[in-house]
Swiss-Prot record:
Subunit structure and binding partners: Oligomer; disulfide-linked.
Biological classification of the source: Eukaryota, Metazoa, Chordata, Craniata, Vertebrata
Range of residues in the leader sequence: 1-22
Compositional bias of kind Basic and acidic residues: 602-613
Biological role: Adhesive glycoprotein that mediates cell-to-cell and cell-to-matrix interactions. Can bind to fibrinogen, fibronectin, laminin and type V collagen.
Cytoplasm recorded as keyword: no
GO molecular function: calcium ion binding
Gene3D superfamilies: 1.20.5.10, 2.60.120.200, Laminin, TSP type-3 repeat
Organism in which the protein naturally occurs: Danio rerio
Keywords, comma-separated and alphabetical: Calcium, Cell adhesion, Disulfide bond, EGF-like domain, Glycoprotein, Repeat, Signal
Pfam family, one: TSP_3
Protein name: Thrombospondin-3b
Superkingdom of origin organism: Eukaryota
Intrachain S-S bonds: C277-C288, C282-C299, C319-C343, C349-C362, C356-C371, C374-C386, C392-C406, C400-C416, C418-C429, C445-C452, C457-C477, C493-C513, C516-C536, C552-C572, C575-C595, C613-C633, C653-C673, C689-C910
Length: 929
């Protein structure tokens, strides 16, 4: 091996051994803390070091995909999730956030700028926390062995509690739990120098002279006299490089300060310093003087003429402008002491018309007033005026068909939507018997919209219009869907022509359509969509790792990251930070039992340790700037320096960074988000969630199957088939109760769809769910056709009545016979189900009839309302129902012992706006009380 390679390696080896034997530095390898005992010992060492050492070094090497981020390392209170110390990477805007608990008990956040950490390659990081035994601490951030930013004079660190077991250590807490990032190392160096910490990640910082001398002496002994000259030159070279690196570091710090100053000036604008006395904040006629004390000015004495001394006494003149009250006259000092002139503030907003421009907010202040932004429904400002926002009611004309209604988008874009029971492009609508979004007959639409084409199954919902054999008859109603001359009921490949009906294995699928023709697989699962069924595919998820070696066989994870070392990769681990090889999840909430605390203060379905807003309900967990703080409790969602609401906000593009706040048309929406508020490349008019870049369209292709009676005697599980790119679901079996639940969680939501039982046999339950948090906590809308007592009277008798029911499920027992009978029973079941509303008509569903539902849920106020249509007629309306059992959750469909059910033309849309009928209901409730 070449000498130039041997020497550096020996240097590192020697110094590493030297430091490991030294009492001045201790190193904690965070990724090797696998159990409570090891973690507690590490916390005790760290807590002691914080009282004795001057510096703490946090080192890490990791790989993070571009623009992603998450929490790299953190110390938390196990009880209330309080952050003692947290280090988060915000790759989207190149920041490292350091959050810690100050000595006064308050949280403090430091932004370290421009660390390019999310570039899809391995990075090394050192965070130096200096001055631990002083009144103020300093931070220095090194990336790839270079200083990139620092912060001085910060509030001191509170330290750690004496009970080491109460502190939780986490790494990669947020984004690393599901993304394909890789954390190679996270280590804490307690004490020592930058040079010693640098050796942990192969950064050759210049150390002290004693170390260098010891290294030289031992290296000479190893290599002999022939290399002394070369070693000497290398030492001198390293010293020169160290000096140069120190100079560059100082220059980098100075440039960082200059850069930050420039950025702040760009946000605030370049202007001359403004006088605190312009305009004069003091009373009229009173002088104003600049002052170094808060608030930056000082007012002179009040005008003498307000109190006039007379020959026989005194008189008080009229109250100052902005106040009202009587004048006062009197004689003698005692009279003046007993009688005071009282001046009361005038509410200019109430008493003076025209104080602000019409349709704007007027704010009364003591002695004056100020004008705010335009009122709701109006756009503009105090300069140009406030004008009515464009609405369907103010158009003055109707662009829509007589059987459609007008919808106004976020940016006053007008669109027309056909009414229930009608279909078309909105400008032209025709009858739609099966309510799947396609008219019975073709319509003469100018834009050639696909929804103007005639329905190829006019009486059976098929919102995808699938037609395998191209004969103009949709698969859903075609007796021979593949056109091979064999009827569907007899065809072992219903959608693939195969006249020979060859079937080499024992399942019900012919070879022509069997993705494992020689291995029985009735479910035909094909996770990676490569045409080869999972049961015979050596790489089920298609990530290039064979199943026998893949720690997540069904979820692509080429990096094979496994932080807890349990053999289950982070990408599919329900407890990625806790050793849990069994992966048990009894309540089906996607959190493994070993780390499932079921502590959820805000009731949004996310336990406090995983909730990015633990005290504010936010089931969507939206975090637009990826800073670890959910938008619902983040004062600056896009982290552009403009607060969402408070001055100098409100931010006119809350989710898109725009410190300039340019708004050319003065409509209150910034130019950068004018037509795409969340910047997800889908215009707001077409976006299912215009204020969430994570959701753009209705899609149930990825769903979780939940069995509600896993121990039932019949034990027939539902068979779910998803069509139309996730907007249609079909259930084919006469099954035990079950759910198909999408993975997208919502705060406020509008959920709609068409339900159709495509058979004349059986008479049991069909419906849908919302607010799903786990298999014991969800809302369900369920509909029985006829009255029937459940055939198993244990554990209790359950009677189902016909009609639509809205239930809140909060089960003590979870999936099993108790919950099964409670769902079947019409009414309340203590500890299991609460009946919130039942259709008083007591009418069951009809065979082969289509019904359209509209469900509105606003968990922030507990508002629920269900409307059901048969054809064009509204046949059931729950009215306003108030319940806050679940504060948001996921959506899905439900069936219980009913086969051949179609949920078609499904649609959801994020909506947190409070409906008008809730306000009316609220007023009525107040009047009653």
């Amino acid at each position: 091996m070449e000498l130039r390679k041997i020497v550096p390696n020996l240097l590192v080896l020697y110094v590493a051994v030297h430091f490991s034997q030294s009492s001045e530095i201790k190193v904690i390898n965070v990724l090797e803390l696998h159990d409570v005992r090891q973690t507690a010992a590490a916390i005790e060492n760290l807590s002691g070091a914080l009282q004795t050492v001057g510096d703490l070094y946090i080192t890490s090497t990791f790989m993070l995909p571009p623009k992603l981020g998450g929490v790299l390392f953190g110390l938390y209170d196990k009880q209330d999730n309080k952050k003692y110390l947290e280090i988060a990477v915000v790759g989207k805007i190149n920041k490292l956030l350091v959050r810690y608990l100050r000595s006064d008990g308050k949280a403090h956040t430091v932004n370290l700028q421009n660390p390019a950490l999310a570039e899809g390659r391995t990075q090394s990081l050192i965070l130096r926390i200096g001055g631990l035994r002083r009144s103020h601490i300093n931070l220095e951030l090194y990336v790839n062995c270079r200083l990139v930013d620092s912060a001085q004079g910060l509030p001191s660190f509170v330290g750690l509690p004496s009970e080491a077991e109460s502190v939780d250590v986490r790494t990669g807490q947020k984004s690393y739990a599901r993304i394909q990032g890789l954390v190679e190392s996270v280590k804490l160096a307690l004490g020592g120098s930058l040079a010693t910490a640098g050796l942990l990640i192969d950064c050759p910082f210049q150390g002290d002279s004693a170390i260098n001398n010891a290294v030289v002496s031992d290296i000479n002994a190893i290599l002999g006299d022939h290399t002394k000259a070369l070693i000497g030159q290398l030492i001198i070279f390293n010293q020169i490089m160290g000096e140069l690196r120190e100079d560059i570091r100082e220059q980098t710090k100075e440039m960082s300060l200059i850069r930050n100053t420039i950025l702040e000036c760009q946000v605030c604008g370049f202007h001359e310093p403004q006088s605190r006395c312009l305009p004069n904040p003091c009373y009229t006629g009173v002088s104003c003087m600049e002052s170094m004390m808060y608030p930056g000015y000082q007012c002179g004495p009040c005008p003498e003429e307000l109190c006039v001394n007379t020959a026989k006494g005194f008189s008080c003149q009229s109250c100052p402008i902005g106040f009202t009250g009587p004048t006062l006259k009197g004689v003698g000092l005692e009279f003046a002491k007993r009688h005071k002139q009282h001046c009361v503030d005038i509410d200019e907003c109430a008493e003076l018309s025209g104080s602000c421009v019409p349709n704007s907010v007027c704010i009364n202040t003591v002695g004056s007033f100020k004008c705010g932004q335009c009122k709701a429904g109006f756009v503009g400002n105090q300069t140009v005026g406030c004008f009515a926002r464009r609405t369907c009611e103010t158009l003055g004309y109707s662009p829509c068909d007589v059987n459609s209604h007008c919808v106004m988008g976020r940016n006053s874009d007008v669109s027309c939507v056909c009414n229930v029971g009608w279909a078309g492009n909105g400008n032209i609508c025709g009858p739609d018997s099966d309510i799947d979004g396609y008219p019975d007959e073709p319509l003469p639409c100018m834009d050639n919209d696909k929804h103007c084409r005639a329905d190829n199954c006019a009486n059976t919902p098929n919102s995808g219009q699938e037609d395998t054999d191209g004969d103009g008859i949709g698969d859903q109603c075609d007796e021979d869907a593949d056109g091979d001359g064999i009827k569907n009921v007899e065809d072992n490949c219903r959608l693939v022509p195969n006249k020979d009906q060859q079937n080499s294995d024992t399942d019900s699928y012919g070879d022509a359509c069997d993705n494992c023709p020689n291995v029985p697989n009735g479910d035909q699962l094909d996770t990676d969509g490569n045409g080869k069924g999972d049961i015979c595919d050596t790489d089920i998820d298609g990530d290039g790792i064979p199943n026998v070696l893949d720690n997540c066989p069904k979820i692509p994870n080429p990096m094979q990251t496994d932080r807890d070392g349990d053999g289950v990769g982070d990408a599919c681990d329900s407890c990625p930070e806790v050793n849990d090889p069994l992966q048990s999840d009894m309540d089906n909430d996607l959190v493994g039992d070993v780390c499932d605390t079921n502590k959820d203060i805000d009731g949004d379905g996310y336990q406090d340790t995983r909730d990015n807003c633990p005290e504010v309900p936010n089931s969507s967990q939206l975090d637009s700037d990826n800073d670890g703080i959910g938008d619902e409790c983040d004062d600056d969602d896009d982290n552009d320096g403009i607060p969402d609401i408070l001055p100098p906000g409100p931010d006119n593009c809350r989710l898109v960074p725009n410190p300039s706040q340019i708004d050319t048309d003065a409509n209150g929406v910034g130019d950068v988000c004018e037509t795409d508020f969340d910047n997800d490349k889908v215009t707001d008019l077409l976006d299912a969630c215009p204020e969430s870049a994570e959701v753009t369209m209705t899609d149930f292709r990825a769903f979780q199957t939940v069995i509600l009676d896993p121990e039932g005697d019949a034990q027939i599980d539902p068979n779910w088939v998803v069509l139309n790119q996730g907007m249609e679901i079909v259930q084919t079996m006469n099954s035990d109760p079950g759910l198909a639940v999408g993975y997208t969680a919502f705060n406020g939501v509008d959920f709609e769809g068409t339900i159709h039982v495509n058979t004349a046999t059986d008479d049991d339950y069909v419906g849908f769910i919302f607010g799903y948090q786990d298999s014991s906590s969800f809302y369900v809308v369920m509909w029985k056709q006829t009255e029937q007592t459940y055939w198993q009277n244990l554990p209790f008798k359950a009677l189902a009545q016909p009609g639509i029911q809205l239930k809140a499920v909060k089960s003590r027992t979870g999936p099993g016979e108790y919950l099964r009978n409670a769902l079947w029973h019409t009414g309340d079941t203590t500890g299991e189900v609460t009946l919130l509303w039942k259709d008083p008509r007591n009418v069951g569903w009809k065979d082969r009839a289509s019904y359209r539902w509209h469900l509105s849920h606003r968990p922030q106020v507990g508002y629920i309302r269900l409307r059901l249509y048969e054809g064009t007629a509204l046949v059931a309306d729950s009215g306003v129902v108030i319940d806050s059992t679940m504060r948001g959750g996921r959506l899905g469909v439900f069936c219980f012992s009913q086969e051949n059910v179609i949920w078609s033309n499904l649609g959801y849309r994020c909506n947190d706006s409070i409906p008008d009928d809730f306000m009316l209901y609220h007023k009525q409730m107040k009047l009653r009380t």
